Amino acid sequence: MIGIDLDVTLLNNRKLISPKDLNILKSAYEKGIHIAILTGRNEYSTKLYADYIGVKSSIIANNGSIIKMENGSTIIIDIEWDKILEVIKCAEILNLHYNLVTTEQIYYHRKPLKHEIFYGDNDIANHSDVVKYSIIESLEDIKDLDEKAFKLHILDDNTWRINKFLDKMPYKTDFDMTKTPENQLEICHKDASKGSALKIIADYYDISSDGIIAIGDSGNDLSMIEFANIGIAMENGMDIIKKKANYITKSNEENGVYYGIKKFINL
């Protein structure tokens, strides 16, 4: 099985999949290798890219909060509503920007920041971000919602405030938290991560961990890089990923996915 991240891994900086990367994934699938796409993106956006790749694949969205098998079987791991509201309250006290991803839409605190939105010059990227969203002023606007929450983003350009939030954040042990290169925290249920999702898929299809390759670049890829028998980091990836990986491939602008897979699989 090949588990692969989307942004800054399979996708280049324009949100395109290169022909080389696309073809090697198709070749792997034709050889009987299961393909799993694991991303922090929402399910709708992820499925558009999966459809473009053109092979049956498992889809893992919102950092492992939604796991959809090839046959459509779906596992949802949502956050307890009361607990996430307490976390949001902590963020508001520190005047931090946040957004909340639910079953229905994305709730942006005040307004979306530029780096919260994916930009691209191709049809997939443009369509993949047409997602319903609302602007809220405070948690008072969402506290009584009847929706399931999957992921909370905490964002700020000031690292000190982010660290202060981590010191004060309630229910830390109930969540899985990862940091992105854009200085934002991604907060999900403690049982929702790319690594745990990859294990669920492997168990479902009876795939040994010895037969798993994971490719990623960012903090939310760490758990799957550690779980896989072979963890591949992108050259443009975070240092923590490179240190844990078995191999560092070329960047997302240089067909890194192609060269990483070719290194370990004869296709």
Language-model regions, residue ranges each:
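Short, structured coil segments at secondary-structure junctions
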Residues: 53-55, 62-63, 171-173, 227-228, ...
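Non-catalytic pre-domain segments flanking phosphatase-related domains
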Residues: 1-4, 23
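Short active-site oxyanion
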Residues: 32-36, 56-57, 151, 210-211, ...
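Conserved acidic, metal-coordinating active-site core of Asp-based
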Residues: 94-96, 101-215
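Short hydrophobic/aromatic-enriched beta-strand-loop microsegments
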Residues: 56-63, 118-120, 177-179, 231-235, ...
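Active-site phosphate-binding/coordination module
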Residues: 16-121
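Mg2+-dependent phosphoryl-transfer enzymes with acidic/Ser/Thr/Gly-rich catalytic loops
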Residues: 1, 12, 18, 186-267
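Active-site metal-binding loops of divalent metal-dependent hydrolases
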Residues: 8, 41, 64, 216-218
